[in-house]
């Protein structure tokens, strides 16, 4: 999987950037995503996170991670409105699945609050957002249980334990 990483803050250590790429590639293999899959991750500060949270979620505060899932629109590729395409073909034509925005301020706060390493927190946020992009959610108790169990399984197998 290809992950484009952007550090808008200029403060994220190169080790965290590499870890983020690696843990997302690891998670992609766990979900059996194609190697051609692409996504982006942008590291932001709380001010930018607040702005994005307001824009995309209509929530007036910063948050730790914002996940924007991308679904290709077949109308961008074909003019025949009556033609329906299999999802696999759409994925091949546009392998970009979405983007994450991770707040470095929230990552530092939460690592301290939860008493684990900053590496663990960045990994947690990346995998959490990645799972959202891939259809997982935690609004209902059974969804939360499934998503959080998978998230912990990925992080533990990768080596980011509490």
Swiss-Prot record:
Co-factor: note: Binds 1 zinc ion.
Single GO molecular function: zinc ion binding
Cofactor: Zn(2+)
SUPFAM superfamilies (UniProt xref): Metalloproteases ('zincins'), catalytic domain (SSF55486)
One GO cellular component term: cytoplasm
Keywords: Cytoplasm, Endonuclease, Hydrolase, Metal-binding, Nuclease, Ribosome biogenesis, rRNA processing, Zinc
Coiled coil: none
Subcellular location: Cytoplasm
Pfam families: YbeY
Its EC number(s): 3.1.-.-
Alphabetized PROSITE patterns for the sequence: UPF0054
Cited PANTHER family: ENDORIBONUCLEASE YBEY, CHLOROPLASTIC
Similarity comment: family membership: Belongs to the endoribonuclease YbeY family.
Known role: Single strand-specific metallo-endoribonuclease involved in late-stage 70S ribosome quality control and in maturation of the 3' terminus of the 16S rRNA.
The name this protein goes by in its record: Endoribonuclease YbeY
The species this protein was found in: Lactococcus lactis subsp. cremoris (strain SK11)
Designated gene of the protein: ybeY
């Amino acid at each position: 999987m290809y992950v484009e990483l952007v550090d808008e803050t200029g403060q994220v250590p190169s080790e965290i950037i590499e870890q983020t790429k690696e843990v997302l590639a690891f998670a992609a293999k766990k979900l059996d995503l194609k190697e051609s899959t692409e996504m982006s991750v942008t590291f932001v500060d709380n001010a930018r996170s607040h702005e994005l949270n307001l824009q995309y979620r209509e929530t007036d505060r910063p948050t730790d991670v914002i996940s924007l899932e991308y679904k290709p629109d077949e109308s961008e590729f074909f003019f025949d409105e009556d033609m329906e395409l299999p999802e696999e073909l759409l994925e091949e034509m546009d392998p970009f699945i979405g983007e994450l925005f991770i707040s470095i301020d929230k990552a530092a706060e939460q690592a301290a609050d939860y008493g684990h390493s900053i590496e663990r927190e960045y990994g947690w946020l990346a995998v959490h957002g990645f799972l959202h992009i891939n259809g997982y959610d935690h609004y209902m108790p059974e969804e939360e249980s499934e998503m959080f169990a998978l998230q912990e399984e990925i992080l533990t197998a990768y080596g980011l334990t509490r």
